[in-house]
Design a protein with these regions (language model features):
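Short, flexible, basic/aromatic active-site loop/helix in glycosyltransferases
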Residues: 164-186, 190
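Active-site donor/metal-binding and catalytic loop motifs
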Residues: 232-252
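A short, conserved alpha-helix in the catalytic core of glycosyltransferases
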Residues: 187-195, 199-204, 210-237
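Short beta-strand-to-loop acidic/aromatic patch adjacent to the donor-nucleotide binding site
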Residues: 113-126
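Non-catalytic, C-terminal membrane-associated alpha-helical segments of glycosyltransferases
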Residues: 251-260, 269-326
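Conserved donor NDP-sugar-binding/catalytic core segment of glycosyltransferases
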Residues: 128-162
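Glycine-rich, basic loop-to-helix element that forms the pyrophosphate-binding segment
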Residues: 94-111
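N-proximal low-complexity "stem/linker" segments adjacent to membrane-targeting elements
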Residues: 2-57
């Protein structure tokens, strides 16, 4: 086998406790085809999609600068056949269980392109999924993430516009099917998006300590807004599911608590963020943790906020109250 295995490290920067993901990276030979897009493609694979080979073949004909195919299990596929059929594709094979965000971090570390389109093997990927003109237009907007329109198998629209609010002192996110081009949305549905890679890395990528995909996705998106970045909708970019839409598990758990401490609890004043000690008792009341574990989690988040105090532009209160004006 000509490909050489490499060890990969998460792109999560020093704003988190860095974590090395044990994985193998193979392939990625220089293609003789000229790339027409100054964009990389990241394909998240479930391992059981019947569209796998067709999607990879179509991606190689789209003109992407680089293609990174990310597996969710080391036993999901015939490696030798894929490397032979798609030598230009770089395959990331995790050797341990990792969340989607962790795997996207690894893929982002493997690309130098200014932008990356994150996809899944559960959607229809055509050779015209992203044209050169649309790619240039999206990249020129210089925002952290641009969210595509998404359609279900039956061609019905999937909600992609999410608006933050508060209900009974708890974050309440409402969805809306009515969308227009360039409208803001709180987060990208199912991680789908056209990402600015430099902004992604400056934000620190996904937090590996948040295990549940919904909260991991929401954490990075919320952080982007609080740190002065934007996420918006493009009606010119669209994706369609070829399989059932995955259920979204937003059940509050320890992942939600980590999200709360990093995003909802900090207060920004005079250009600095702080997680006040006065927030500990309310946090303890909602956490259902023992006093020592609750204090450990609170202290960890407080240290993180302190390290990044100057990165915050606004706090959650301002984001929610001024939504649509920012």
């Amino acid at each position: 086998m000509a490909a050489v295995a490499e060890n990969a490290m998460s792109t999560t920067s020093s704003i988190f406790n860095e974590r090395q993901i044990n994985c193998t990276i193979l392939g990625g030979a220089r293609s003789e085809k000229k790339s027409v897009l100054n964009v990389a493609a990241i394909l998240l694979n479930s391992g059981n999609s019947y569209l796998r080979l067709q999607n990879l073949e179509n991606l190689t004909k789209c003109g992407f600068e680089k293609i990174v195919s990310v597996e969710n299990d080391s036993k999901n596929f015939n490696l030798d056949d894929l490397l032979q059929n798609f030598p230009e594709v770089k395959f990331v094979i995790p050797l341990e269980k990792a969340a989607d965000g962790d795997l996207i971090n690894v893929a982002m570390a493997e690309i130098d392109s200014p932008c990356a389109l994150v996809l899944r093997d559960s959607i229809h990927i055509t050779q015209k999924i992203l044209t050169a003109q649309l790619s240039e237009n999206l990249a020129a907007q210089d925002v952290f993430c641009i969210v595509p329109r998404i359609f279900a198998q039956d061609k019905t629209a999937v909600p992609i516009k999410f608006v933050p609010g508060v209900k009974k002192s708890v974050l309440n996110i409402e969805s809306d099917l009515q969308i227009s081009n360039d409208e803001p949305t709180l987060y990208p549905f199912d991680f789908f998006g056209f990402y600015n890679t430099k902004k992604f890395k400056r934000l620190g990528g996904y937090d590996y300590s948040i295990k549940k995909p919904y909260w991991q996705n929401l954490d990075l998106a919320f952080r982007a807004w609080l740190w002065g970045e934007r996420i918006k909708i493009s009606t010119g970019l669209s994706l369609s599911y070829a399989e059932e839409i995955p259920l979204v598990d937003s059940t509050p758990d320890i992942s939600q608590l980590r999200f709360f401490l990093k995003n909802m609890a900090p207060v920004v004043k005079d250009g600095r963020a702080d997680l006040p000690l006065s927030k500990f008792l309310p946090f303890k009341a909602r956490s259902s943790c023992g006093i020592f574990e609750a204090f450990r989690q609170f202290s960890s988040a407080r240290n993180w906020v302190c390290e990044n105090e100057r990165r915050f532009s606004i706090d959650a209160f301002t984001l929610i109250n001024d939504w649509g004006k920012i």
